[in-house]
Amino acid sequence: MPQDPRHPEHQYLDLVKHILENGARRMDRTGTGTLSVFGATMRFSLEDNTFPLLTTRRVFYRGVVEELLFFLRGETDSKVLEKKGVRIWEKNGAKQFLQSVGIDREEGDLGPIYGFQWRHFGARYETSASSYEGKGVDQIASAIAAIRANPASRRIVVSAWNPTDLGSMALPPCHVLFQFNVTDGKLSCAMYQRSGDMGLGVPFNIASYSLLTILVAHLTGLQPGEFVHFLGDAHVYLDHVDSLRQQIQRPPRAFPKLFVSPKGPRTEPEHFQYEDFELVGYDPHPAIKMNMSA
């Protein structure tokens, strides 16, 4: 497929512009309201250590890394992230929010969300403090084993969408499944996202799944290839419209580089720490304030 000769970030900016100009106005579960389109695709090269951390406004890099590692450890207690200064799950883990969606659990217990499904699919969820060692299907371990043993497989798929558990989750998965592909010694990842908040969520998700691909490539001795992002409902919250109109006027800058530099033995994805990743050359435009709709 021919590459867009423009900066790859224009894919994101053009999609935002398209939604602002053509999106259907809808009310949503948060009560904020959105402009929405259905069906979109973006592709980002990860070759030569390229890391597609958007530059037209600052993306919370530490949050990207810490949340991904939180998922890879199978953790579900938002307070683990909050202690690291990452508060992206704080609203959804609040006791009041949990009660509002019919969940009676301790503050911060997010339920069987992404990490639980990735590492223990099919296990019975109890609490965020329970041990699930050896329980359920470890989809991440299975995917890594398949990449090593049968890289041509078309079945290297990980799903966070478990209908049995949806009612127990603080928030059902927005990014519901991903698939790995190995071609010519390069690992690529395609992710399907049923619901994409273009202001806050999607820039974060692009970086998160790119990082996941880079990490798994490191573990399997491959080179990172490409991240492909499929979106179902791609939307702009109405209270983000002015901020995004400002953002799409900014010219993209060069994407930074990301290097995996482990500070100790890292044989499994859950062994990695924030300090094992080195971000070089990130020079974004200033942050733009946007509210989170919970």
From Swiss-Prot:
A single GO cellular-component term on record: cytosol
GO MF annotation: an example: thymidylate synthase activity
UniProt enzyme class: transferase
Any one GO biological process: methylation
This protein's pathway: Pyrimidine metabolism; dTTP biosynthesis
EC number: 2.1.1.45
Residues the record marks as active site: C174
Name of a matching Pfam family: Thymidylat_synt
Alphabetic keyword roster: Methyltransferase, Nucleotide biosynthesis, Transferase
SUPFAM superfamilies: Thymidylate synthase/dCMP hydroxymethylase
UniProt key word Lipid metabolism: no
The reaction(s) this protein catalyses: dUMP + (6R)-5,10-methylene-5,6,7,8-tetrahydrofolate = 7,8-dihydrofolate + dTMP
Binding site for dUMP: R29, R154, R155, R194, S195, G196, D197, N205, H235, V236, Y237
Positions contributing to (6R)-5,10-methylene-5,6,7,8-tetrahydrofolate binding: D197
Alphabetized PANTHER family for the sequence: THYMIDYLATE SYNTHASE (PTHR11548:SF2), THYMIDYLATE SYNTHASE 1 (PTHR11548)
Recorded family membership: Belongs to the thymidylate synthase family.
NCBIfam families: PRK01827.1-3 (NF002497), thym_sym (TIGR03284)
Designated name of the protein: Thymidylate synthase 1/2
Organismal lineage: Eukaryota, Fungi, Fungi incertae sedis, Microsporidia, Unikaryonidae
Gene: TS-1
